[in-house]
Every structure is written in C-alpha cells, then in structure tokens.
C-alpha cells in the first residue's frame, strides 16, 4: 500500500539555514498492518507523518513515496485525502464557525464523489453519523460544535478519531495521538483505532511512548533516531525501548552503522 524509499527531507530553520530532518528513510506498509514509529524528540517522526500527508514547509531532496502504486508527491494534500490518506494531527486544528456536521458531510461527499458514488443526503448522513458516534461513545452535541473550537485536548483527539471513523480512509497516520491524554481518554481513542483496523486498511502510529501500544498492538515497530530508522522489530521492541530507553539505540553503533 505505502512504499517509502530512501527519503531525504529538509526544512528551513529559524536562522534561515536548511536543516536535514530525514536522512534516507525506507518503509513498507501493507494492507492489514499496523506500524509504530517510535523515537526521541526531534528524531523526525512528525516530519515523516506530515510529508506523507503533504503538509507544506518541507523540501523533499531525495527518495520517493508511492501509495497504491501512485506517486504521492504528484498529489496535493486534498488529492491524497480523496485517495484515502488520513492524518490525525499532534495538535488538531481549530475551525471556528464550521460545525463538525457541516465539515464531515462535505468531506464524506467529496470522497464519495471522487469514487463515483452518489452524495449522502441529510437523512442518510445523520443515520451514518449516529452509528459512528454510538460506536465511539460520543455525545451527539459534538456535531453542532465548531470543529475543535473550545475543545479540551482530549476532546480534540477524540474528535480526530471520530473523523477517522467517519471518513474510513485506507491509510491512517496518527501523529502522537496519545499526547496529553489521560488513561480513560487514551482507551477511548485506542478503541476507535482498533475498531477501524481491518484487512483492507493500514495504520501508521507515531508515538514517543510505549503506553499507547498497550492498547493499539502493532505488527511492526520502527525506531527513528536522527532522521534514520535504526532498528525494526515486532511489538516486543517497544517493550524493550520502554525498559532500556532511547539511549540504548542512540549509543549502539551497530544499529546506526547498519542503517547508514
């Protein structure tokens, strides 16, 4: 589904100089899989998520990303979304004056139009939305509120997962969705992601801590350090990181040299 080959990315730093963030990242994600990207702060995790989604501000200096056999760099963010790429932001954006209902109905019908399907009318959409809200234990009053405006941190993250459930993308990229959540909110968010998982889609979970992976169990774990994937493994790798810390891989020359 998603193939990243030898990806190099740089950004312009505050002093105007270019800074290389990703330094030859390669990754293969197939349908039905959940991949966790872990790493210390500043390792390039969010950069990778943002580049997949097509966020502005990054310069691709090498490599390629293909999604369902198509060149992702040839698509703008809106085209990627219509093709089924979804990004749950680390810091969800507020859209004052636009209700969740209006936003999601427009998004759903845009995707349906892209697939050659008829638009949902108001009655169909309301029934569809109520089913999703019930599944996630969401208050129906959320639909009348402006997108993320005045929401608490936990409400914003739950709203992102609600959008995931409604839009039903093929590839979901979750950028530190667990950031700032208490254990109850974390369980709700993880439950929404687990309900989404199927043999027909894939999930990339970007996280700093192992605790999210207690609830969303990954098939593969990749450790990103200084813009490089220095180690990959199964779910047990996350537990090993929790026990030994990131210094374990940062200071182990064998890991770094193997991936240079």
Q: Model-derived features: where do they sit?
A:
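Conserved structural motif at the start of ABC-family nucleotide-binding domains
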Residues: 2-4, 20-22
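The feature captures the beta-strand-to-loop junction immediately N-terminal to the Walker
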Residues: 38-40
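ABC ATPase NBD Q-loop/coupling interface
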Residues: 64-80, 148
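Walker B catalytic motif
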Residues: 173-177, 184
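Helical segment within the ABC ATPase nucleotide-binding domain
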Residues: 186-199
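Conserved beta-strand-loop-alpha-helix hinge in the C-terminal portion
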Residues: 220, 224, 228-251
């Amino acid at each position: 589904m998603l193939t990243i080959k030898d990806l190099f990315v740089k950004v312009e730093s505050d002093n105007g100089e270019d800074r290389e963030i990703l330094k030859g990242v390669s990754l293969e994600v197939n349908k039905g899989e959940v991949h966790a990207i872990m790493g210390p702060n500043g390792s390039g995790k969010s950069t990778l998520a943002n580049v997949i989604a097509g966020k502005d501000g990054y310069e691709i200096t090498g490599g390629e990303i293909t999604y369902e056999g198509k060149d992702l760099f040839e698509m703008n963010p809106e085209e990627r979304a219509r093709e089924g790429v979804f990004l749950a932001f680390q810091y969800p954006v507020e859209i004052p004056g636009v209700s969740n209902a209006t936003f999601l109905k427009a998004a759903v019908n845009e995707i349906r139009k892209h697939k050659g399907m008829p638009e949902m009318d108001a009655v169909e959409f309301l029934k569809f939305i109520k089913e999703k809200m019930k599944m996630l234990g969401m208050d129906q009053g959320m639909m009348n509120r402006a997108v993320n405006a005045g929401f608490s941190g936990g409400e914003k993250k739950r709203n992102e997962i609600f959008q995931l459930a409604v839009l039903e993308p093929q590839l979901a990229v979750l950028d530190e969705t667990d950031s700032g959540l208490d254990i109850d909110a974390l369980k709700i968010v993880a439950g929404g992601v687990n309900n989404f998982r199927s043999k027909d889609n894939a999930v990339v979970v970007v996280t700093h801590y192992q605790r999210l992976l207690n609830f969303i169990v990954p098939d593969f774990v990749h450790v990103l350090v200084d813009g490089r994937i220095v180690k990959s493994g199964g779910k047990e790798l996350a537990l090993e990181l929790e026990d030994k810390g990131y210094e374990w891989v940062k200071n182990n020359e064998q890991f770094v040299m193997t991936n240079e």
